[in-house]
Amino acid sequence: MYCALVTATDSITTKLLNAFRPRTSAPSTATVLRSVLWPIAILSVIHRSYVLGTNGYITDDFGPVYRAVINFKLGLDIYNEQFDHVDPHYLYPPGGTLLLAPFGYLPVDASRYWYISFNVLAFLIAAYLMLRIFDYTLSSVAAPALVLAMFCTESVTNTLVFTNINGCMLLGAVLFFRWLLKGGRNAELLAGAAIGLTLVVKPSLAPLLLLPVLNRQFYTLITAFGVPLVFNIAAWPLVPDPMNFVRHTVPYIMSTRDYFNSSIVGNGIYYGLPMWLILLLRVVFLLLAVGSLWLLYRYYRERDPRFWLLTSSGVLLTASFLLLSLGQGYYSTMLFPFLMTVVLPNSVLRNWPAWLAIYGFMTMDRWLLGHWPTTGRFLEYMKITYGWSLMLVVVFCVLYFRYLDAKQDGRLDQGIDPPWMARERTPAPV
């Protein structure tokens, strides 16, 4: 044991000294990029978690969670929120309360810091698993680039600053994808368990259950529904007021609020759009999403399962954020697996309109204008909505134009990718 520790210490010392020694040959581009990106990525993770996360913000998503688990421990009412104010509310079902109950046995600050730590760890594990899904390793340039890109986004930063659970949600989604791609009964059951744990807390990833149905991976549904069912059955007699969740909280969840809501209906109500126009917009974007999903299913499900699964997930989640009653900016965290498809040669994201859309729902830039406050508020409040909307337009247009070209060339039976893409199915090594 002692020899192993000495060897490890010597190895670390040697690596540190080698970083400052003159090179005997010109470093590769990948080596230079890794040297640049890793320090920035690591410090960005530390800054977002240790500095911004612990400093917190006026928006505190953890406060209601902590009050709920403390009330659960003490046997007090949990689902007694006053929904007539705009502060964060506790909306998790009894099963989610049971899952998070251990945080109620720590002092509030310690509990919050552990909550942040678990989410940071979940983000990092999810990043590693995404690299493996796309055949990259930690020694590639893609590793620090992905970590840096994730922790520079509004969605990850606000997840940690507001102390939300989206890091664990992302990890659940990535595990779900990884096991679905692996295939087999055991992997399908594990995929269902992974997404089922997220459904115990909130239903944000529920639209993804369409994917195993379309791919005939029905074992996934057993654990996807079984895990939240078991947690809620176990929690029901332990929660003092479980029916208040049904009578009081569920109607609020199903309603539409006109603040901190980037969905079409949320921003539409905020800006006073007529309901017929809101409905028309929702129908238009629903049709775009359905068209994209059909093209993906018809031409990619069997030819390119990875591309089909992850691109379809992006369409499903983006459409749900945009079309359902509530869409918040940090929900975009769950889109990282979809955005990683940019490394694939047939990605729908290799064009500038796609990255204009991504800027809209991922940027930390604030567009509030001191001299023109009305214009500034509009730009700030609508950038996420426009980003999600443009993304659905981009995906449909890319796939539809591929379809038209393939139909014109008479090669629909070979798929809709341009012929040159057939020679570049795998991402280039980085």
Curated annotation (Swiss-Prot):
Transmembrane segments: 26-46, 114-134, 136-156, 160-180, 194-214, 218-238, 276-296, 307-327, 352-372, 381-401
UniProt keyword terms in alphabetical order: Cell membrane, Cell wall biogenesis/degradation, Glycosyltransferase, Membrane, Transferase, Transmembrane, Transmembrane helix
Localization annotation: Cell membrane
Single Gene Ontology BP annotation: cell wall organization
Catalyzed reaction equations: Adds an alpha-D-arabinofuranosyl group from trans,octacis-decaprenylphospho-beta-D-arabinofuranose at the 3-O-position of an alpha-(1->5)-arabinofuranan chain attached to a beta-(1->5)-galactofuranan chain
EC numbers: 2.4.2.47
Involved pathway(s): Cell wall biogenesis; cell wall polysaccharide biosynthesis
GO molecular function: hexosyltransferase activity
Residue pairs linked by disulfide bridges in the UniProt entry: none
Pfam families recorded: GT87
GO CC, any one term: plasma membrane
Entry-linked InterPro entries: GT87 (IPR018584)
Membrane topology: Multi-pass membrane protein
Primary localization: membrane
Coiled-coil portions: none
Disruption phenotype: Cells lacking this gene result in colonies with a more erose appearance compared with the usual glossy appearance. The mutant yields arabinogalactan (AG) with a significant reduction in arabinofuranosyl (Araf) content concomitant with a relative increase in the amount of galactanfuranosyl (Galf). It shows only a slightly reduced growth rate.
Family statement: Belongs to the glycosyltransferase 87 family.
The protein's role, per its UniProt record: Involved in the biosynthesis of the arabinogalactan (AG) region of the mycolylarabinogalactan-peptidoglycan (mAGP) complex, an essential component of the mycobacterial cell wall. Catalyzes the addition of an arabinofuranosyl (Araf) residue from the sugar donor beta-D-arabinofuranosyl-1-monophosphoryldecaprenol (DPA) on the C-3 of an alpha-(1->5)-linked Araf from the arabinan backbone of AG.
Name this polypeptide is given: Alpha-(1->3)-arabinofuranosyltransferase
Organism in which the protein naturally occurs: Mycolicibacterium smegmatis (strain ATCC 700084 / mc(2)155)
